Design a protein with these regions (language model features):
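Secretory targeting signatures
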Residues: 1-17, 22, 171
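Short active-site neighborhood of thiol/selenol oxidoreductases, capturing the structured segment around
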Residues: 23, 40-63, 79-81
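N-linked glycosylation sites
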Residues: 29, 41, 47, 88, ...
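Typically the conserved alpha-helix immediately C-terminal to a functionally engaged Cys/Sec
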Residues: 61-75, 93-97
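Thiol-based oxidoreductase modules, predominantly thioredoxin-like and allied folds used
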Residues: 76-92, 104-115
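Short, internal strand/loop/helix patches
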Residues: 96-135
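Thiol-/selenol-based redox modules, centered on thioredoxin-like
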Residues: 130-171
């Protein structure tokens, strides 16, 4: 049996200096029209946490993740954005209806087309989910299929209480 790790017998001093904490990043300003023609923008969420869920109508594995987030996040706290402006996928009402049919239940979340916002947040995989704290800073980014509802709940609760100091560092 071979165990990886420290195998040297001689004692070594390890620098235990501080770890640089990344600066908080503000979620970009945005505005979109939802699948039901409602106008939405970031100012509607001033002093409130929310989740920005980026996906595409053709992403099959994204539906199970969307289902998990939808099951646990409070009403009105998740926006679903598509980055794909291709004519075949730009109908948000069709995407909303297809998702409801596939999940066999009502999804009471706004579905919005916003490729520039996807680019602004650096979306590089699907799904791409950002948890935004009440001050408008991105607290957590979750990339790829993620269906652990307990973990999503914990991330949401942490996001709601996440605080940024005056230097832009997470406390």
């Amino acid at each position: 049996m071979f165990l990886s790790g420290c195998t040297a017998e001689e004692e070594q001093l390890i620098d235990e200096g501080g770890i640089e904490v990344p600066l908080a990043t503000a979620f970009p300003n945005w505005s979109s029209t939802s699948h039901d023609s409602s106008e939405m923008n970031n100012s509607m969420f001033e002093n409130e946490s929310y989740v920005a869920y980026f996906s595409a109508p053709w992403c099959g594995h994204c539906e199970s993740s969307l289902d998990a987030y939808d099951q646990v996040l409070p009403e009105g706290k998740m926006m679903i954005f598509s980055y794909d402006a291709d004519e075949d996928y730009s109908d948000m009402n069709a995407w909303h209806n297809k998702t409801e049919t596939n999940l066999n239940r009502t999804i009471d979340r706004p579905f919005m087309l916003n490729p520039p916002l996807a680019q602004a947040v650096g979306m590089n995989s699907l799904p791409f989910v950002l948890f935004v704290n009440p001050d408008g800073f991105v607290y957590h980014v979750q990339v790829g299929k993620f269906t652990d509802q307990d973990a999503i709940t914990n991330l949401w609760q942490s996001t709601e209480s996440a605080i940024v100091d005056e230097d832009g560092r997470w406390l």
